[in-house]
Amino acid sequence: YLQGAHSNRFKAPTLVRAIFSSGLFAEGWAVYTEKMMADAGFGGPEVHMQQLKMRLRVIINSIIDHKIHTKGMTEQEAMAMMMNEGYQEDGEAAGKWRRACLTSTQLSTYYVGSAEVEGIKAAWETKNKPNLLKMNDEILSFGTPSPKCIKRSMGL
């Protein structure tokens, strides 16, 4: 919600920037902030464990997305990986299978996007003193472009 609110306030310099946003950044930002809050102790160990479980799902979803579209992964193989290694319920895994078959790369946006945001954070911290509030506010100030555009706009 916070990222969306910031994006709505952003005054795009071009019509293209106003119309198009980056799912890679939006989904990656969500995963990044979930991890950031759990790392800060929000919700205690229970929330941290849940965040780790969700992180595992994000990684597995990215793996199956890749394997379905480039390695011929079967539905049975994907379902087994999601349920046995990712602790996903049958209904959730079946829905992910359908999504992966209909949209290539969408399931990967969560993991790849969060890795890109973590990369922005690492680059920012090499040039600045660690200050999550300042860094996060600067990241959000650019709306919802690709992480690559944000990194460039931040001079990183």
Give the ranges of each region predicted by the language model.
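N-terminal maturation segment of proteins
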Residues: 1-156
